[in-house]
Amino acid sequence: MNQFEAYSLLFVDSFVSNLIISFQNELIFHSMQMLVGYNRLIMLLVAICSSLSGNTVNYLFGKIVLNIFYASKNEQNILRHKNLTKLYYQYETFIIFLISFPFWGCFVSLFSGFFKTKFLKFLSIGCLAKACYYASKIYIF
């Protein structure tokens, strides 16, 4: 397998593992770490880009769920959503930073879309969180 195929496989694996419907872990990432012939910086950049792509899909899915939720026009649920949104906005930055955890991060991105987090804020904090996570995986562990 040449390096382009390996990096493409890393992108697809990280993308799929960050989707809300997937419960797998990023297996190719760990395999590439064990085989030391790969550039760590490129691995870091590819993993960050692919995970942000997956989280963006989850964010958009959260927006779709929100539109369906408001289309139901159930006043009691809408009032509950507004109260939860106020609570979410109090801890928004911390909650978005939890995107760095592999399993729970996909749910955080879904909830960010559902609670109408600003997209650029979501992407910037999510990028920083994933960069910290992957850098610690590559350079420390």
Curated annotation (Swiss-Prot):
Statement: the UniProt record of this protein carries the keyword Membrane: yes
GO cellular component annotations of the record: plasma membrane
Location relative to the cell: Cell membrane
Location, primary (coarse class): membrane
Stretches that traverse the bilayer: 41-61, 95-115
Keywords: Cell membrane, Membrane, Transmembrane, Transmembrane helix
Bilayer topology: Multi-pass membrane protein
Protein name per its UniProtKB record: Uncharacterized protein RP436
Lineage: Bacteria, Pseudomonadati, Pseudomonadota, Alphaproteobacteria, Rickettsiales
